[in-house]
A protein has these predicted regions:
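Generic preference for well-ordered alpha-helical elements
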Residues: 89, 109, 113-116, 155, ...
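Helix-loop-helix junctions within predominantly alpha-helical proteins
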Residues: 5-88, 125-229, 241-255, 259
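Central hydrophobic cores of alpha-helical transmembrane segments in multi-pass inner-membrane proteins
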Residues: 67, 95-99
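Membrane-cytosol interface segments
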Residues: 2, 11, 94, 103-111
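Internal catalytic or translocation cores that form aromatic/hydrophobic pockets or channels
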Residues: 109, 115-134
Length: 273
């Protein structure tokens, strides 16, 4: 149970573990964003940790570029079938957008950090029992949305990068002397010939890693929006409860109606930020 109370009849939560509540709100999205190096670090982070985080960002961008650049060169130099070009362009556009989203997450780290601070502050300052229940319900629903997003994104990645290549028919060339399975993202032969082993296997697993990274970036962006939206929704529900008690008051609210109205307006402005 979140928010331990001293008496069941007491509606004001006097003893609670707000850190546990904060983890409930952000634990999944934090795990996912730390994995790709976009979770905002504390201002007290050491220089070594910052350099390590920057290195992780460079590696992630390089891995996604590993999918895009060879495939674009392949389209320009070796493809002449309009349908196949259009088909491959759809997959490439997903990777290009993943790079754009990744840079967006990096450049907006300060905004994300401020959003997380708002969540932490709201949990710390929420003491009324019914308000905390509303917050917990919204946080749990937000985590369910994150889990659903992760399921579909990673499920699609498994199908596209693992199931689809293994189910595809093998290609036979050189009068039957060479047989191989095509990669999800073709590589121009001017770069390297991936038809032979073990080059093909290396590129296959590198593409799988890069693909899962691209899906992680997309899932992180969607999940972050879900977490913030559900937190704001929970605060709006609390605001509605405060408005309902504007006239008659409540144990945790001010005795003066004008002061209660001022608090409600201030809280509403805070939500809109």
């Amino acid at each position: 149970m979140y928010g331990t109370i001293t008496e069941k009849t007491n509606t004001v939560a006097t003893v609670y573990d707000y850190k546990k509540d904060i983890r409930l709100s952000v634990q999944l999205i934090r795990w996912m964003m730390e994995m790709i190096g976009t979770w905002p670090k504390s201002t007290m982070t050491s220089s070594i940790e910052r350099y390590a985080y920057t290195l992780l960002n460079v590696i992630c961008i390089a891995l996604i570029s590993f999918l895009v650049v060879p495939a674009i060169i392949y389209i320009v130099l070796e493809m002449d079938n309009g349908y196949l070009i259009l088909k491959l362009s759809g997959a490439l556009s997903f990777c290009v957008l993943a790079i754009v989203k990744y840079f967006s997450l990096i450049f907006h780290k300060e905004d994300i950090r401020n959003g997380i601070k708002y969540i932490e502050s709201d949990w710390i300052n929420t003491r009324y029992y019914s308000d905390r229940i509303t917050m917990i319900r919204s946080a749990k629903f937000g985590q369910h949305l994150v889990a659903i997003c992760m399921f579909f994104m990673y499920g699609g990645a498994v199908f596209f990068y693992l199931a689809l290549p293994f189910s595809a028919s093998k290609i036979t060339e050189d009068e039957g002397n060479l047989t191989y399975q095509p990669l999800v993202y073709p590589v121009a032969r001017v770069i390297i010939d991936v038809r032979h082993s073990p080059v093909r296997e290396i590129f296959f697993w590198m593409q799988c890693l890069s693909g899962f990274l691209a899906h992680s970036i997309t899932a992180s962006g969607c999940s972050l929006a879900a977490v913030f939206a559900m937190h704001a929704y929970g605060r709006m529900e609390i605001l509605i409860q405060w408005i309902e008690h504007l006239i008659d008051g409540r144990k945790d609210l001010c005795d003066n109606m004008n002061e209660r109205l001022a608090i409600i307006i201030e809280h509403h402005v805070r939500i809109l930020r």
